[in-house]
Regions:
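ABC-type ATPase nucleotide-binding domains, specifically the catalytic core motifs of the NBD
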Residues: 15-17, 92, 96-111, 119
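A short, proline-enriched helix->beta-strand linker immediately N-terminal to the Walker B motif
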Residues: 148-152
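Conserved ABC ATPase "signature" region
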Residues: 107-125, 176-177
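The feature captures the beta-strand-to-loop junction immediately N-terminal to the Walker
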Residues: 40-42
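Conserved ABC ATPase signature
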Residues: 129-133, 137
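Helix-to-loop junction immediately C-terminal to a conserved catalytic motif
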Residues: 55
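Conserved ABC transporter NBD signature motif
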Residues: 63-75
């Protein structure tokens, strides 16, 4: 399978009053077309910085990121970011939020927005405003707004971190269902090992700062994945051992 995303020799440091702060050591990895990769690591190790570099929002000091074999030095039009903070416009309805990113001349914008609202379980809420929705429903709006523009790559930075455990689990199940219907390459940053196992095809474990990839785990289990199955429990234990737990 062809590589969709190639990260080669990435390094990054920031200037501080106490001198350079080395955040990212040398990191190399590839993500195949249609693959779901999760990146986990200790708090403050540079996960978000790494994602911002991969997504094109931060320039590395060394190395390069290539999408479809072409080096990128800024955000790729083929990708879109879903963050923990959220990006729903409070003055727009669900339908209007979904239509916002579509080209002004896109035919049937409303029909397309309504289709994706239905896909993420928001049928009947198209005319609702964000303040009328729960946290889980708002996250569904964000997901639908990302998907409606048909990105080839989804960059996700702790997208479910603000949700309660049950809602987070429901959203994981919804996301896997959608990805079974539509092909997207995904890069997920998360502190939640179970979330990574539940969603990903491969998991990269980052070291403490300056971050490097200290371990890679394949996740060969079919979906749906049961978090209490012996295989999943065993994989979780192996990943946690990388953190000394």
């Amino acid at each position: 399978m062809a590589a969709k995303l190639v990260v080669k020799g990435i390094r990054k440091s920031f200037s501080t009053d106490k001198g350079p702060l080395n955040v990212i050591g040398e990191i190399n990895f590839t993500v195949d077309d249609g693959e779901f990769v999760a990146i986990v690591g200790p708090s403050g190790c540079g996960k978000t910085t790494l994602l911002n570099i991969v997504a094109g929002f931060v320039r590395p000091d060394q190395g390069e990121v290539a999408v479809d074999g072409i080096a990128r030095y800024g955000p790729s039009p083929k990708g879109i970011v879903i963050s923990q903070q959220g990006s729903v416009f409070p003055w727009l309805t669900v339908q209007q939020n979904l239509m916002f990113g579509l080209n002004g001349h896109h035919p049937d914008k409303k029909a397309l927005a309504d289709r994706y609202a239905s896909m993420v379980g928001l049928k009947g809420f198209e005319k609702g405003y964000p303040h009328e929705l729960s946290g889980g429903m708002l996250k569904r709006v964000e997901l639908a707004r990302a998907l409606v523009v048909k990105p080839e790559i989804l960059y996700m930075d702790e997208p479910l971190a603000a949700l309660d455990a049950l809602t987070s689990l429901q959203m994981r199940i919804e996301l896997r269902r959608i990805l079974a219907e539509e092909r997207h390459t995904c890069v997920l940053i998360t502190h939640d090992v179970e979330e990574a196992i539940h969603l990903a095809d491969r998991i990269f474990v980052l070291s403490a700062r300056p971050a490097t990839i200290q371990a890679t785990f394949e996740v060969p289990f079919p979906h749906p994945r049961h978090l209490l199955s012996p295989e999943v429990v065993g994989l979780k234990a192996a990943i946690l051992r990388e953190f000394g737990l």
